[in-house]
Amino acid sequence: MADFTKFLTTAPVAFILFSSFVFALFIEINRFFPDILTF
């Protein structure tokens, strides 16, 4: 179990979680405010 918790705290897992959160936030912003570059 210690190895599993050590794996969850590594940098790639944190990067995957953070990047998936940022991409989901960007997709939701584009869903509610489409074509934001035309403003």
From Swiss-Prot:
May help in the organization of the PsaE and PsaF subunits. This is Photosystem I reaction center subunit IX. Belongs to the PsaJ family. InterPro entries: PSI_PsaJ, PSI_PsaJ_sf. The chain crosses the membrane at residues 7-27. It is a single-pass membrane protein. Its main location: membrane. Gene3D superfamilies: Single helix bin. GO terms for cellular component: photosystem I; plasma membrane-derived thylakoid membrane. It comes from the Bacteria. Signal peptide: none annotated. It is found in: Cellular thylakoid membrane. Keywords: Membrane, Photosynthesis, Photosystem I, Thylakoid, Transmembrane, Transmembrane helix. The lineage of its organism: Bacteria, Bacillati, Cyanobacteriota, Cyanophyceae, Synechococcales. GO terms for biological process: photosynthesis.
